Swiss-Prot record:
Superkingdom classification of source: Archaea
Record-level Gene Ontology MF annotations: structural constituent of ribosome
A Pfam cross-reference name: Ribosomal_S2
Keyword vocabulary terms for this entry: Ribonucleoprotein, Ribosomal protein
InterPro entries per UniProt: Ribosomal_uS2, Ribosomal_uS2_arc, Ribosomal_uS2_CS, Ribosomal_uS2_euk/arc, Ribosomal_uS2_flav_dom_sf
Matching CDD domains: RPS2 (cd01425)
Gene3D superfamilies registered for this protein in UniProt: Glucose-6-phosphate isomerase like protein, domain 1
The name this protein goes by in its record: Small ribosomal subunit protein uS2
GO BP term (any one): translation
Sequence similarity: Belongs to the universal ribosomal protein uS2 family.
Ranges of Acidic residues composition bias in the record: 1-18, 28-42, 65-81
Biological source species: Haloquadratum walsbyi (strain DSM 16790 / HBSQ001)
Length: 279
């Protein structure tokens, strides 16, 4: 390893990295509940430019890593139908998921994400199944708890994902790369910032496409927070969530940190407001 433990690096240049090479299959044998998809129509690493012509989805400007939604999309509709089993045992009350807008998808969906969508609202927004979000956070925590903290990498190019991603890294002892992901970070040993993690957590497979591409190249698993418009063919474990909203990302990273610490037998002393990015 060439880096210090628990390192956090932020690159302020927000230019998107675009994946143009041929797709590479990811070995999912490391996790029983891994989500590598086999649909031939979704075999390329998702990028904003690729998505425009994809036959399985219609994607728009809300996929840009710089285009963050306003928090009014996360309105307090606390009685909204967001999961098939209203009595499901969740990590936090369903009202807390709703108030953060974790369930709010986009007006586009992919065939990959269809199984995580509970319904479509009258305004055309797809509603994610919160019970699956909750379940996948637990699964991801179980998975991450098997790794040495300094061998975990979390990335986020999205504005509202950067702070909670860094806070997650600080909480669990992982490394963080936020802002623009420098090409060669995982693949070029001559690059000064080169690292060799064993697992990568990404905030959005579109905005973090370069990190996903390099993880595939070196053969390490990818855990991704995926919205209704994401493709997941290069992802090993999907956490379905609103991956654009400020409060939604704070809640998911907070829960993931606390659950990972819990599975290590460590104390979870972090409060939600410690993970919330400023507006």
């Amino acid at each position: 390893m060439t880096e210090n433990d628990n390192e956090v690096v932020e690159v302020v240049d927000d230019d998107e990295a675009v994946v143009s090479e041929s797709p590479v299959d990811v070995d999912t044998a490391t996790e029983a509940e891994a989500d590598t998809e086999t649909d031939e129509s979704n075999e390329t690493t998702p990028t904003a430019s690729d998505a425009a012509g994809d036959e399985t989805t219609t994607q728009t400007g809300n996929e840009s890593a710089d285009a963050e939604p306003d928090d009014e999309l996360e309105g307090p509709t606390f009685d909204e139908d967001v999961m098939p089993d209203e009595e499901a045992d969740l990590l936090i009350p369903v009202e807390d998921y709703l108030s953060a807008g974790v369930h709010i998808g986009t007006q586009q969906k992919t065939s990959d994400m269809e199984r995580f969508i509970h319904r479509v609202r009258d305004d055309g927004l797809y509603v994610l199944d919160v019970s699956q979000t909750d379940s996948r956070i637990r699964t991801a925590a179980n998975f991450l708890a098997n790794y040495n903290p300094d061998q975990m990498l979390v990335t986020s190019s999205r504005q509202y994902g950067r702070f909670p991603a860094k806070k997650f890294a600080d909480a669990v002892g992982a490394r963080a790369r936020t802002g623009r992901f420098i090409p060669g970070t995982l693949t070029n040993p001559d690059y000064a910032g080169y690292i060799e993690p064993d697992v990568v957590v990404v905030t959005d497979p579109i905005g973090d496409a370069q990190a996903v591409k390099e993880a595939i190249t070196v053969g390490i698993p990818v855990i991704a927070m995926c919205d209704s418009n994401n493709q997941t063919s290069n992802t090993d474990l999907v956490v379905p969530t609103n991956n654009k909203g400020r409060r939604a990302l704070s809640v998911v990273y907070w829960l993931l940190a606390n659950e990972t610490l819990d599975r290590r037998g460590a104390d979870s002393l972090y409060a939600l407001d410690e993970f919330e990015a400023e507006i």
